[in-house]
Amino acid sequence: MGGLGSAPLPPLGPEDHLLGADEDEPLIVYADYECPHCAVLHARLVRDGGSWAFRHFPVRSKHPRAWAAACAAEAAALQGAFRQMHMALYADRARLEDPHLWERARALGLDVERFDADRRSDAVLARVRRDFESGVRAGVVTTPTVFERGAMRPSAPDEM
Amino acid sequence: MSVVAAGTPVPDFVLRREDYRRFTQDDLRGKTSVLVFYPHAFSPVCTDQLNLYEEVLDRFAEQGATLYGVSCDSVWAQRAFKEKLGITIEQLSDFEPKGAACRAFGVYHEKGFPQRALVMVDPDGVVQWSYEAPSPADLPGANLIFDALAAR
């Protein structure tokens, strides 16, 4: 594997998860599901009718369940339920252990067995890692980091 | 005072490892090392910085680079910081005489802590690349270190 040297922010692509209003130039948000500042940003984007693409940026020593939560969202995406799982994860950041993830999958009507296999799969791990690495290469250092028209907007929670 | 420049031999220095053994310029020989000078254990930006680098530590290892965290905190404070974060990056203490190694590397801030800076040292003990953040609040991305590793 090569290094993670600087590279431009990848433009929006078909694999990106678009959320909120349908606008031409959505924000690109690097975030994780365990991060309190990300949850604040999420709530404000929802409240304000924002338009954004969500990319995973889990850092395990900071947020031990962030990788598991990101993989859960991607596993749900394989059953067409990314947005629903995304909202359910931010709805209760304190409950991110495995049984809580299964419970969410059940509540969303997903095939839980498949969900559980998918969230542990290499493909899902690679999908999350791709987002994370694209962020590292674009200079993301913390969460949440917002890109607006391709330019990084470092966001302290009070400024969002 | 500014960070030691690329192309110069690493200065003589003594830091303390987590078990209080000495860590000197000789310990940098034979491998590529990145010294991560950070202002304060437990501060928010230093926390984010070490967490981020820890997340990609295996990728640094693939590139043959070993990272060390360096601050003027005591060995005990560094150990507690490392334990709290749950990271594995080895910590080196410049506590007594305070800041002597940081001064040798040109990264000692007048207010009594290391500037946020990165120093890459090649296996022969020569500084290969260095970077000083514009301010202690600026966190250099891991990408900058990978860029420097790729440019070797």
Per-region residue spans from a language model:
Chain A
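Detector for methionine-enriched segments
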Residues: M1, M85-M87, M152, M160
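Sparse, context-dependent recognition of short Cys/His-centered cofactor- or disulfide-binding micro-motifs
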Residues: L4, G20-E23, F57, A70, ...
